Amino acid sequence: MLKFIIFALTVALCEAGPANNVVRPCRLDDLKCIRDNISANSNCNANVRGSIPSEYVIPRFNFETPFFNASYIDNNLIIRNNDACRVSEFFFNVKADTSVLAVDCPNLDLESDRTLIQHASLQEETTYNYHIRGIYPLIRLTTNLLNADRLNLCNAFTYADVTALPIFKIDPKDRPTANFLSRDLSLLNIYERETFAYRPPQLIRQFVNSLICDFGCQ
């Protein structure tokens, strides 16, 4: 059975009205209230470290861009400003048995030595290498947690909205890479959408497991 922290629920119900199935039990800046409500409806560990490093490194991060027939490897991916993320929405839909948690991440900074593997039919793959750093004005992560009385971040889907294109700097490591990389940015929005089909689980888990409740998945 879905459980709420009663003192917060009373306020939320007054705001929502009796006919509304959506319950917002917490202020968005009240991580303790969010933690209490999530931990009451899951098996997560509420004893979290309470902070995110301003900068941390992932040794290897793989992603694909099917539209461009390419695979990518971010080597020594440096992530900055994940600690600046803030909760932008949190509610339970009682009728749908679902909880929604959204997090806004301003100025998300990603830097890596990237390997690009270009695929083509009936041909060998071609590999290119470059250093890249991109700063995203705002990435909005929205996670739908099904079975609201048995919440599990580890198997939940997180959608990333790239609200604005990044400011980035690219340093090709050789002449073939420099010649290959396009200066035409007209398809950058498609590229970023495909890229951020892969990044959300790591970003939301870092935030939730560090600040709200630890589900034990990386």
From Swiss-Prot:
Tissue: Produced exclusively in the posterior (PSG) section of silk glands, which are essentially modified salivary glands.
Superkingdom field: Eukaryota
Chief subcellular location: secreted
Signal peptide: 1-16
InterPro entries in UniProt: Fibroin_P25
Pfam families given in the database record: Fibroin_P25 (PF07294)
Protein's name in the database: Fibrohexamerin
